[in-house]
A protein has these predicted regions:
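Loop-to-transmembrane helix entry/capping segments in MFS-fold secondary transporters
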Residues: 27, 117-127
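Hydrophobic core of transmembrane alpha-helices in multi-pass small-molecule transporters
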Residues: 85-102
Length: 177
């Protein structure tokens, strides 16, 4: 639950990408950002699903690291002035959302594979309730950081993604083959 909780930031970060490099014109590039997000969902579901079936623990690690890296890359694009270029943030968002798809796939597979068959619904209910609370907490954290701007939020989200990915490393392998 701790790994999933830390990686919830991958679901909360995309609106902050919209705010980068745009100022008043941030919404003008929204179509490209939506296209990047949809393409990542399409491309990622098959690949991450197959990899999660082999090792959801490794997918949680890898997708946490990728999310941290691409959030950091977005921050670097903003501070270097590249975020205002029409294609930069959509490309970074595509890869960030690809990592989010990895988190989504692996967290579900890990939960199903680790829980005894007769207790899966109880495990899922408990995990989903805990994640709901953690989403509120990480959302509030992101909101507080947003007072300093989207860069601060993305830095915080990158740190939490990094922590979530690293915390996935010592998890047990639970796949059945």
């Amino acid at each position: 639950i701790a790994v999933r909780g830390l990686l919830t930031v991958t679901a909360l970060a995309p609106p902050y990408f919209v705010l980068l490099g745009g100022g008043q014109s941030a919404l003008q590039g929204l179509g490209a950002l939506l296209l990047a997000s949809a393409a990542a969902a399409f491309a990622g579901s098959y690949v991450w699903g197959r990899l999660s079936d082999k090792s959801s623990r490794k997918v949680l690690f890898l997708s946490g690291m990728l999310a941290a890296g691409f959030a950091t890359l977005a921050v670097l694009a903003e501070v270097s002035g590249w975020a205002g270029t029409a294609w930069v943030i959509p490309v970074i968002l595509f890869f960030f959302m690809l990592s989010y798809q990895g988190v989504r796939s692996a967290r579900s597979v890990y939960l199903v594979d680790m829980s005894p068959e007769d207790a899966r619904s109880s495990y899922a209910a408990l995990a989903n309730t805990a994640i709901g609370v953690l989403l509120l907490i990480t959302g509030a954290f992101g909101g507080l950081l947003a007072l300093a701007g989207p860069v601060a939020s993305l830095i915080g989200f990158a740190a939490l993604s990094l922590a979530g990915g690293l915390l996935a490393l010592p998890l047990d392998e639970v796949e059945n083959g």
